[in-house]
A protein has these predicted regions:
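ABC family nucleotide-binding domain
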Residues: 1-140
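C-terminal boundary and immediately downstream tail of ABC-type ATPase nucleotide-binding domains
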Residues: 128-131, 137, 141-160
């Protein structure tokens, strides 16, 4: 799971943050975990940050490290909770590009987001919730072009 406020351990380097779960579960040796951390950092375009600490990174870089950390345990499903909401607008795209690449590779992603253009672009199914309840569910085409509830119609008129 990836959260909006990164949840990186400040006393660990970028690599150590990524290696922690695979090492604690005896999933990988230290050497294999280091190799995997480097591969994952390359995947999110941050290999040069391997030995840096979270406070040396931008918000977008921290979020990409959080993505790499989540991928370190080889999940079948990636859960993303408002992963761009704490970022400056110029950093949002770098995180969304990583998520888009994962979706294209076939990763199942469940994402809570207000990034409607992004949701429309990469989603197979969109769920619109209002006041804690599901109001509409369907293809991006259906929900964005033919919203049936007043709540979704109102929401889309404000954000699109």
């Amino acid at each position: 799971m990836i959260f909006q406020n990164f949840n990186l351990f400040p006393h660990l380097t970028v690599a150590e943050n990524i290696m922690l779960a695979p090492r604690l579960t005896n999933y990988l040796t230290k050497e294999k975990a280091q190799e995997q951390a480097l591969r994952l950092l390359q995947r999110v375009s941050l290999a040069d940050k391997f030995d840096e600490y979270p406070d040396q990174l931008s918000g977008g870089q921290k979020q990409r490290v959080a993505i790499a950390r989540a991928l370190a345990i080889n999940p079948e499903i990636l859960l993303c909770d408002e992963i761009t909401s704490a970022l400056d607008p110029q950093l949002v795209n770098e995180v969304l590009l990583v998520i888009e690449a994962l979706a294209k590779e076939g990763m199942t992603i469940i994402m809570v987001t207000h990034e409607m253009a992004f949701a429309r672009k990469i989603s197979d199914k969109v769920v619109f919730m209002y006041s804690g309840k599901v109001h509409e569910m369907g293809s991006p085409e259906m929900l964005f072009n033919h919203p049936s509830t007043p709540e979704l119609q109102r929401f889309l008129s404000m954000v699109l």
